[in-house]
A protein has these predicted regions:
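Membrane-anchoring alpha-helices and their flanking helix-loop junctions
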Residues: 1-113, 125-187
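Histidine-centered phosphotransfer motif of kinases
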Residues: 117-125
């Protein structure tokens, strides 16, 4: 079984959109249940023009990923599906944990508890990992192709956020940054 390019582009009810939109739904539910934490998470008042461009490009790329996932059927009964499902489920659980860890953080302080002990950007990382799981479970090269710019533009957002955190939280954030990888156990 190999990654499929043209053969997987078909609309269906049992396609990659189900887990893809579930990841988006988690974000929406968090914003509704915890409006203060949600407000803090989406505050872009400090964005530079470059950060705004990255945010716009990342949002457009995320929309493309979600749209392409509608046309990417799962490869049920294959190793692709099994491995992709396991990757997705692990990422989904850790993605949810990252929201609860974020909520537990105190306003005005660097969030360092929960899963933030292992990653400075767990929401981004586990969203990407979950979407990679969907790519694997569908064996869709189309989906993988649109994931690449999404990951690149999101990385640009992360770099901007880290500059902001360093300027805002100073030495405390620099110490946190020195001991905690940007992406779960890497970098």
């Amino acid at each position: 079984m190999e990654l499929s390019f043209f053969t997987t582009f078909e609309i269906g009810w049992l396609n990659g959109w189900i887990p893809s939109f579930a990841m988006l739904l988690v974000q929406i539910i968090f914003m509704m249940l915890f409006p203060q934490g949600g407000k803090r998470a989406v505050d872009t008042s400090w964005y530079t023009p470059r950060d705004r461009r990255y945010a716009l490009l990342s949002s457009a790329a995320q929309a493309a990923v979600l749209i392409v996932s509608i046309f990417a059927p799962f490869k049920f009964g294959t190793a692709w599906f099994t491995v992709g499902t396991v990757v997705y489920l692990i990422a989904f659980v850790l993605f949810i944990w990252s929201f609860f860890s974020y909520k537990a953080g105190k306003p005005g302080e660097t969030i360092q508890g929960g899963i933030y002990r292992y990653s400075r950007n767990p929401m981004y990382f586990f969203f990407m990992l979950g979407m990679l799981g969907v790519c694997i479970a569908t064996a869709s090269l189309w989906l993988l192709i649109v994931m690449v710019p999404f990951a690149v533009f999101t990385h640009g957002i992360i770099l901007g956020e880290e500059r902001y955190c360093e300027a805002t939280y100073g030495e405390g954030y620099r110490k946190y940054k020195a001991r905690t990888p940007r992406y779960f156990l890497i970098v």
